[in-house]
Curated annotation (Swiss-Prot):
This is Chaperone protein ClpB. Disulfide bonds: none annotated. The Clp repeat (R) domain probably functions as a substrate-discriminating domain, recruiting aggregated proteins to the ClpB hexamer and/or stabilizing bound proteins. The NBD2 domain is responsible for oligomerization, whereas the NBD1 domain stabilizes the hexamer probably in an ATP-dependent manner. The movement of the coiled-coil domain is essential for ClpB ability to rescue proteins from an aggregated state, probably by pulling apart large aggregated proteins, which are bound between the coiled-coils motifs of adjacent ClpB subunits in the functional hexamer. GO terms for molecular function: ATP binding; ATP hydrolysis activity. Residues 6-71 are annotated as: Repeat 1. Residues 341-545 are annotated as: Linker. ATP 1 binds at G206, E207, P208, G209, V210, G211, K212, T213. It comes from Pseudomonas syringae pv. tomato (strain ATCC BAA-871 / DC3000). Belongs to the ClpA/ClpB family.
Length: 854
C-alpha cells in the first residue's frame, strides 16, 4: 500500500505514531500507537467522532496506555521502527473500505472503522466501550456527506463550523453571555428581516460602542429561551471567527478553500444556522491576492440564493467606506440602524449588568454609581458612545476598589515603612555610647512600641474587613450560579427544581448577604467595599483631567477665597478678578450652562495692566502651573487662510494629518484656560469659527471630529479702546460706553453678543505699582535664594524704583525694565566679579540718585 494514498492528516498521525513507538522503545508501530496518535491529533476528526457516538475518551486513553505498556521493549533502539503486521493489515482493510466507497485517498475515519474488528486486540478494546460498529458507520456517513474523498487535505476542511465559528446559542445556554437589557426594537427588526424569504440578511449599523454585538447576543438568548417566531426556533447562531479563518493560510487558495468548506457545511445545514459576522467590512478584500477573489465576492452567490443566513455588524464609517462601494454586496443586506441609547436606557442596561460585574470584581456596586456613570460619561466623555463608556467607568471603578482590597491599605503601608526606618535608626544608635544617643534610643524604642501596637490594631481591623468583603463576594457568586441554574431549569421545564431555587435557595442566599452587609462596621473603615458616585467621579477625573470628583474641604475654602489668591499675583482690577472667580465657582458647583464654555471673557484695557497676567494666575490657581494654559497669539492669524491652523488643514492640503492647533490642544486637555491674546489683530474670518465655540461649546475640526469646549475658560485680550480708558479715568459709565462703542465698531454684533462678560481693566495707579514692585522683587529674591543670597532694599530705593517704573500709559511693563536696569544689571556684575559669597545678604540703598549695593 502506497503512503501517498493516505490523506495528509493520516500521514501526520502515522508519523506521530512512529515517534511514539521510538519514545517508548517498542520494536514496531502497532495499531494502538496509531489510535493514540489519532486521538491526540490537533484539529483531527477522530476525537469529535468518538465523542459523537458516545465513547468515554478518558477511559479509552487509559486502556490504550495500558495496552502500550504491555508491549515488549527493546534495549539500545536505533530509532528505525517499521509497521507491524497488525498495522499493515489494518491499513489494507481501510484501503478496501476506501475503494468500496469510491475514494481516491484513505481517510482517518476509515482506519477507525476498519479497527472495529472483533478479531483484533484494538477492535476488542474499542468494542468494549459499548458502541456498535453500525452506530460508528452512521456517524461517519453523516461526517462525510455524499461526496467521495478525492482530496488529500479534505480532513482539514471538515468541521469547518467548529473550527472557524463560535456557537453563541451554546454560550447563551451555558450562561456565559451578559444579559441584554432593552434593545427590543432593534432585536425585533433583526428577527423581522431574518424571517424574509429572500435577502433575509440584516446588517447592524451604528457607532462603535452602542451595542451591535450585544444585539446578536440578545438574539441568541431569545432563541434559547424560545422567545422567537416558529421560523427561528431551534436554530443556532454562530459567530464567524475571521482570525481563525485567515490564520495559517500560507498558500494561495488555502483561505478560499477554508471559506468554501465553511459555506458548503452551512448549505448542508439547510437554514438551521444563522451566521453572525462581526466587523462585516473585514470580509471585503479579505484574502484578496493578485487576480483572486475576496471573501465578499465569495459570499454574494450564497447570500443571493438564501443558502447563507447571515447577520452582519459594522460601524457607519466602515459601512460607507467598504460595503456601500460594492453595490452588489450592499443590496444583499438589509440595514438595521442601532442608535446610541439615552441616559435612562443606559441606566437600565447598567442595572442589568450590575450583578455580573459585582461577581467578577467581588465588590458591591451602588445604584448611585450606576446613575453617576451614565450621567458623567454622557457629559464629560464626548468622543465615545453610551452604553460602552458608562460600562467602562463601572468596570474600572470596581477594578480600582478590588485592587485596594487585595493590596495593603495606604495607612498600614506608611506605618510599616516608618517602623522599618525607626528600627534601622535604633540599630545604628545601639553602637553609640554617649548620653545623647542613649536618650534618643530610649525615645525611639518607645515610639517603635507605640507604632507596633497601632499597626497591629489596624492590621486586625483590615483582616476582619477583608474577610467580610470576601464572604459577601462568595455569597453573591452562589446567587449568580443559582440564577443561571434557575434559567436552565425553566428551559427544561423542571418545575420542582425551579420552585426549590426560586422559593428556597435564592431567598436564603439573599438573606445571608443582607445579614453580612448589615454586620459590616461603619467606623474604622480601612477598605472601601462599594463602588459609589465618588469612585465613578474619580475615574472620570483620571480619564479627562476634569475635576468632577467631590470637592475636599480644602478645595472649597480655596474656591471661596479665590479673589484673594488671584490678587497675590494681580494687583487691582477688582471687576476682572471677581468675574473670573464667579465663572470658576459656577463651573465647580455644577451650575454653569452644560452646553457652553465655563466662562468666556473679553479683557479690554491699556497695555501692561495685567490682562495676560490674570490668565496666567487663573491657570496657576486651577492647575498649580501657569503652563497649563493654551495660549494662542492672534497676531499670527492676520491672513484669511490662517484660520486653517486653528482647526486643521482641509483634506488634500499639506498638514491635514496633523490636526488643528486649537482643536488638538483642547482634545488632549478638555479642562483648560484658553487665552486668545491680542484678539483684535486677527483676521475677521477667524471670529466666525469662534461663534459656535462661544455659543454651543463645540467645534468641528478638519477630520470631522467634534471637540468639546464646555469645560474650558476662554479669555480674549485686546487693546481696543485703551485711549478712551486713559482719557476717561474715574468715570466708569462713560469709560464703558466709549470702549463698547470701539468694540462694536471692530467686532460683529453676533460675536460680541456671545461673550459672557466684557471686562474693562483700569489704568494702574501709583500705589498699585508699589504692590507689583513687591511681586517682581519677590521673584528676583527667589532666583537669588537659589544662589544662597538674600536681598534687602531700603524704603528710598523702593520709592526710586516706583518713581522710575510708573507710567500711566504703559502700565507695569516700564517697572520690569526699571528693575532690570537699576537692580539686576548691577547685581549681575557684582556676583560675577565675586563680590558676594554664598550666604551673603545684599543691601540696596540710594546714594547720589543711584541705587548702590553693598
Amino acid at each position: 500500500m502506497r503512503i501517498d494514498r493516505l490523506t495528509s492528516k493520516l500521514q501526520l498521525a502515522l508519523s506521530d505514531s512512529q515517534s511514539l513507538a521510538v519514545g517508548l522503545d517498542h520494536p514496531a508501530i502497532e495499531p494502538a500507537h496509531l489510535m493514540q496518535a489519532l486521538l491526540e491529533q490537533q484539529g483531527g476528526s477522530i476525537k469529535p467522532l468518538l465523542l459523537q457516538v458516545g465513547f468515554d475518551i478518558n477511559s479509552l486513553r487509559k486502556e490504550l496506555s495500558a495496552e502500550l505498556d504491555r508491549l515488549p521493549k527493546i534495549q539500545n533502539p536505533t530509532g528505525d521502527v517499521n509497521m507491524s503486521q497488525d498495522l499493515a493489515r489494518l491499513l489494507n482493510q481501510a484501503d478496501r473500505l476506501a475503494q468500496q466507497k469510491g475514494d481516491q485517498f484513505i481517510s482517518s475515519e476509515l482506519v477507525l472503522l476498519a479497527a472495529m474488528d472483533e478479531n483484533s486486540k484494538l477492535g476488542k478494546l474499542l468494542l468494549g466501550q459499548g458502541v456498535s460498529k453500525k452506530a460508528l458507520e452512521n456517524a461517519i456517513n453523516n461526517l462525510r456527506g455524499e461526496g467521495a474523498v478525492n482530496d488529500p487535505n479534505i480532513e482539514e476542511s471538515r468541521q469547518a463550523l467548529d473550527k472557524y465559528t463560535v456557537d453563541l446559542t451554546k454560550r447563551a445556554e451555558e450562561g456565559k453571555l451578559d444579559p441584554v437589557i432593552g434593545r427590543d426594537d432593534e432585536i425585533r427588526r433583526t428577527i423581522q428581516v431574518l424571517q424574509r424569504r429572500t435577502k433575509n440578511n440584516p446588517v447592524l449599523i451604528g457607532e462603535p460602542g452602542v451595542g451591535k454585538t450585544a444585539i446578536a447576543e440578545g438574539l441568541a438568548q431569545r432563541i434559547i429561551n424560545g422567545e422567537v417566531p416558529d421560523g427561528l426556533r431551534g436554530k443556532r447562531l454562530l459567530s464567524l471567527d475571521m482570525g481563525a479563518l485567515i490564520a495559517g493560510a500560507k498558500y494561495r487558495g488555502e483561505f478560499e478553500e477554508r471559506l468554501k468548506s465553511l459555506l458548503n457545511e452551512l448549505s448542508k445545514q439547510e437554514g438551521q444556522i444563522i451566521l453572525f459576522i462581526d466587523e462585516l467590512h473585514t470580509m471585503v478584500g479579505a484574502g484578496k491576492g493578485e487576480g483572486s477573489m475576496d471573501a465578499g465576492n465569495m459570499l454574494k452567490p450564497a447570500l443571493a440564493r438564501g443558502e447563507l443566513h447571515c447577520v452582519g455588524a459594522t460601524t457607519l464609517n466602515e459601512y460607507r467606506q467598504y460595503i456601500e462601494k460594492d453595490a452588489a454586496l450592499e443590496r444583499r443586506f438589509q440595514k438595521v440602524l442601532v442608535d446610541e441609547p439615552s441616559e435612562e436606557d443606559t441606566i437600565a442596561i447598567l442595572r442589568g449588568l450590575k450583578e455580573r460585574y459585582e461577581v467578577h470584581h467581588k465588590v458591591a456596586i451602588t445604584d448611585g454609581a450606576i446613575i453617576a456613570a451614565a450621567k458623567l460619561s454622557h457629559r464629560y466623555i464626548t468622543d465615545r458612545q453610551l452604553p460602552d463608556k458608562a460600562i467602562d467607568l463601572i468596570d474600572e471603578a470596581a477594578s480600582r476598589i478590588r485592587m485596594e482590597i487585595d493590596s495593603k491599605p495606604e495607612v498600614l503601608d506608611r506605618l510599616e515603612r516608618r517602623l522599618i526606618q525607626l528600627k534601622v535608626e535604633a540599630q545604628a544608635l545601639k553602637k553609640e555610647k554617649d548620653e545623647a544617643a542613649i536618650k534618643r534610643l530610649e525615645k525611639l524604642q518607645e515610639e517603635i512600641v507605640r507604632l507596633e501596637k497601632e499597626y497591629a490594631d489596624l492590621e486586625e481591623i483590615w483582616t476582619s474587613e477583608k474577610a467580610e468583603v470576601t464572604g459577601s463576594a462568595q455569597i453573591q457568586q452562589k446567587i449568580e450560579q443559582s440564577r443561571q441554574e434557575l434559567e436552565a431549569a425553566r428551559r427544561r421545564g423542571d418545575l420542582n427544581r425551579m420552585a426549590e431555587l426560586q422559593y428556597g435557595i435564592i431567598p436564603d442566599l439573599e438573606r445571608s448577604l443582607q445579614m453580612v452587609d448589615q454586620h459590616g462596621k461603619p467606623e474604622n473603615q480601612l477598605l472601601r467595599s462599594k463602588v459609589t458616585e465618588e469612585e465613578i467621579a474619580e475615574v472620570v477625573s483620571k480619564w479627562t483631567g476634569i475635576p468632577v470628583s467631590k470637592m475636599l474641604e480644602g478645595e472649597r475654602e480655596k474656591l471661596l477665597r479665590m479673589e484673594t489668591l488671584l490678587h497675590n499675583r494681580v494687583i487691582g482690577q477688582e471687576e476682572a478678578v471677581v468675574a473670573v472667580s464667579n465663572a470658576v465657582r459656577r463651573s465647580r458647583a455644577g451650575l454653569s450652562d452644560p452646553n457652553r464654555p465655563s466662562g468666556s471673557f473679553m479683557f479690554l484695557g491699556p497695555t501692561g495692566v495685567g490682562k495676560t497676567e490674570l490668565c496666567k494666575a487663573l491657570a496657576e490657581f486651577l492647575f498649580d502651573t501657569e503652563e497649563a494654559m493654551v495660549r494662542i497669539d492672534m497676531s499670527e492669524f492676520m491672513e484669511k487662510h490662517s484660520v486653517a491652523r486653528l482647526i486643521g488643514a482641509p483634506p488634500g492640503y499639506v498638514g491635514y494629518e496633523e490636526g488643528g492647533y486649537l482643536t488638538e490642544a483642547v482634545r488632549r486637555k478638555p479642562y483648560s484656560v484658553i487665552l486668545l491674546d491680542e484678539v483684535e489683530k486677527a483676521h475677521s474670518d477667524v471670529f466666525n469659527i469662534l461663534l459656535q465655540v462661544l455659543e454651543d461649546g463645540r467645534l468641528t475640526d478638519s477630520h470631522g471630529r467634534t471637540v468639546d469646549f464646555r469645560n474650558t475658560v476662554i479669555v480674549m485680550t485686546s487693546n481696543l479702546g485703551s485711549a478712551q480708558i486713559q482719557e476717561l479715568v474715574g468715570d466708569r459709565e462713560a469709560q464703558r460706553a466709549a470702549v463698547m462703542d470701539a468694540v462694536s465698531t471692530h467686532f460683529r454684533p453676533e460675536f460680541v453678543n456671545r461673550i459672557d462678560e466684557v471686562v474693562i481693566f483700569e489704568p494702574l495707579a501709583r500705589d498699585q505699582i508699589a504692590g507689583i514692585t513687591d511681586i517682581q522683587l519677590g521673584r528676583l529674591r527667589k532666583r537669588l535664594a537659589e544662589r544662597e543670597l538674600t536681598m534687602v532694599l531700603s524704603p528710598e530705593a523702593l520709592d526710586k524704583l516706583i518713581a522710575v517704573g510708573y507710567d500711566p500709559v504703559y502700565g507695569a511693563r516700564p517697572l520690569k525694565r526699571a528693575i532690570q536696569r537699576w537692580i539686576e544689571n548691577p547685581l549681575a556684575q557684582l556676583i560675577l566679579s565675586g563680590g558676594f559669597e554664598p550666604g551673603s545678604s545684599i543691601t540696596g540703598k540710594v546714594v547720589d540718585d543711584e541705587i548702590v549695593f553693598g
